[in-house]
């Protein structure tokens, strides 16, 4: 879950403020969703689930509550439950990027790699100009040891997000897996040139020799 950088104390202060508002307006869905989002930032998965369930009891199709609940359930290793929520979101909004990505990784954790690849393919078809679609599919392909196709997807993602050095590192790892060590070293060199500290890449550099 991405959010603006705040300290844990700032998140707790936000939670206290939201709780005060909920005491005044206990039936406002927006407040319960805000509370769930803050609880996720505080890694309080069970409390976040309670807030999501409060919303879903009144509005069973609420997309934000389903998404937050899926995320929390994955953190609690309840991947089958997370899968159900992601699928419900996608029934309502088939092009929901984050839910499709969440479903792909949930299926990986459930060791349903072929299903994960199917959804990753759908993701790329629906979002051909989004680098995350290609990185998600590449992640599945790496799990399946389909390194050639993973390399293609890393390269597509890099073309869409050329300043993302993590993609270069992933590409280098894939080239190493393919035995293409010189190309891997050149890719690592580019990542260093673009700002990645070389010291963090020493283990990979060693594998290119």
Task: Map each language-model feature to its residues.
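Register position in tetratricopeptide repeats
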Residues: 41, 75-76, 109-110, 143-144, ...
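N-terminal leader/linker segments that initiate helical-solenoid repeat arrays
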Residues: 1-46, 50
């Amino acid at each position: 879950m991405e959010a603006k950088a705040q300290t844990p104390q700032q998140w707790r202060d936000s939670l206290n403020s939201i709780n005060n508002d909920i005491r005044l307006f206990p039936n406002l869905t927006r407040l319960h969703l805000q509370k769930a989002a803050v609880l996720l930032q505080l890694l309080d998965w069970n409390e976040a689930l309670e807030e999501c369930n409060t919303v879903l009891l009144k509005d069973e199709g609420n997309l934000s509550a389903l998404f937050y609940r899926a995320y929390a359930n994955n953190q609690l290793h309840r991947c089958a439950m997370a899968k159900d929520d992601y699928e419900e979101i996608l029934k309502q909004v088939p092009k929901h990027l984050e839910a499709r990505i969440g479903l792909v990784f949930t299926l990986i954790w459930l060791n349903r790699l072929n299903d994960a690849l199917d959804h990753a393919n759908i993701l790329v078809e629906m979002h051909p100009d989004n680098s995350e679609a290609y990185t998600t599919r590449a992640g599945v392909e790496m799990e399946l040891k389909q390194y050639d196709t993973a390399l293609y997807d890393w390269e597509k993602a890099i073309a869409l997000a050329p300043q993302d050095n993590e993609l270069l590192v992933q590409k280098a790892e894939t080239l190493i897996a393919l035995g293409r060590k010189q190309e891997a070293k050149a890719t690592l060199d580019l990542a260093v040139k673009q700002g990645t500290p070389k010291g963090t890449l020493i283990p990979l550099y060693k594998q290119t020799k």
